[in-house]
């Protein structure tokens, strides 16, 4: 019983330390200059047309972590690090199968697309671009062919390096 109490105490100290270390970063994010540069709906459209690729990219990174740090094989076997697997699988579940404001299950990426469509962003090209990125073997060449800004291409190529 004492071991459990010590473990819980150590976990609380560890989590509190993480929270304290994150606070300055959260403040920096809250005060980011980007918030001051978006002054109109057109500015927001420009931003979201680029940012949508980061939303999709995050899910790709998350799936990479899930593949490499959890068990997704058949036959199934226990994960070597169940705490990490639990965290990753919880994030995946939230990102892939959250509920929108109407209670409809959908991914955060799909919610983002719905959101930007609501203020006039056309998402057809975005979806065509993302759907064309379907092979890791050719992804760098496929990214290069996309009709998007070079900085977005660089961002995506960095992820898939």
Q: Which residues does each predicted region cover?
A:
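Non-cleavable N-terminal signal-anchor transmembrane helices
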Residues: 14-29, 113-116, 120-127
């Amino acid at each position: 019983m004492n071991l459990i109490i010590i473990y819980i105490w150590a976990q609380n100290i560890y989590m509190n330390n993480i929270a304290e270390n994150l606070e300055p970063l959260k403040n920096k994010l809250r005060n980011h200059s980007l918030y001051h540069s978006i002054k109109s709906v057109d500015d927001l459209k420009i931003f979201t047309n680029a940012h949508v690729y980061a939303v999709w990219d995050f899910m790709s990174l998350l799936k990479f972590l899930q593949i490499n740090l959890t068990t997704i094989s058949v036959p199934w076997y226990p994960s070597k690090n169940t705490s990490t697997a639990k965290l990753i699988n919880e994030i995946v579940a939230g990102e892939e199968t959250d509920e929108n404001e109407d209670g409809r299950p959908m991914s955060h990426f799909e919610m983002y697309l719905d959101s930007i469509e609501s203020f006039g962003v056309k998402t057809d090209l975005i979806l065509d671009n993302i759907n064309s990125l379907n092979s890791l073997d050719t992804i760098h060449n496929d990214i290069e062919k996309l009709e998007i800004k070079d900085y977005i291409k660089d961002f995506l190529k960095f992820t898939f390096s």
